[in-house]
């Protein structure tokens, strides 16, 4: 009986882990407080800083399947843990 109970606990933990989804910040401001749950296949949080004109910066944050590319004068940081793209 104890073996059956232990087996059920292990199976439950494994099944719950398969349903894990990443949570990333998602807003265009420097100081962000909005979160989004990433879709299936999106395993990366990113923060992209675009320099549009001198002294004009644009922040982009969100989820992605792969780390986004950059243009000259852009910076991108990618990570893979919850809310890591601050």
From Swiss-Prot:
InterPro entries the UniProt entry points to: Snake_3FTx, Snake_toxin-like_sf, Snake_toxin_con_site, Toxin_cobra-type
One of the record's GO cellular component terms: extracellular region
Cell compartments where the protein resides: Secreted
Superkingdom per UniProt: Eukaryota
Disulfide bond sites: 24-45, 27-32, 38-63, 67-78, 79-84
PROSITE patterns found in the cross-reference section: SNAKE_TOXIN
Gene Ontology MF terms in the entry: acetylcholine receptor inhibitor activity; ion channel regulator activity; toxin activity
Pfam families named in the record: Toxin_cobra-type
Keyword Disulfide bond annotated: yes
Family that this chain belongs to: Belongs to the three-finger toxin family. Ancestral subfamily. Orphan group II sub-subfamily.
Free-text function comment from the UniProt entry: Binds with low affinity to muscular and very low affinity to neuronal (alpha-7/CHRNA7) nicotinic acetylcholine receptor (nAChR).
Protein's name in the database: Weak neurotoxin 5
């Amino acid at each position: 009986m104890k073996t059956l109970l232990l087996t059920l606990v292990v199976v439950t933990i494994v099944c719950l882990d398969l349903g894990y989804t990443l949570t990333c910040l998602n807003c265009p401001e420097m100081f962000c407080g909005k979160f989004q749950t990433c879709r299936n296949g999106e395993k990366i949080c990113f923060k992209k800083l675009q320099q549009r004109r001198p002294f004009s910066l644009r922040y982009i944050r969100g989820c992605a399947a792969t780390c986004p590319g950059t243009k000259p004068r852009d910076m991108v940081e990618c990570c893979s843990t919850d809310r890591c793209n601050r």
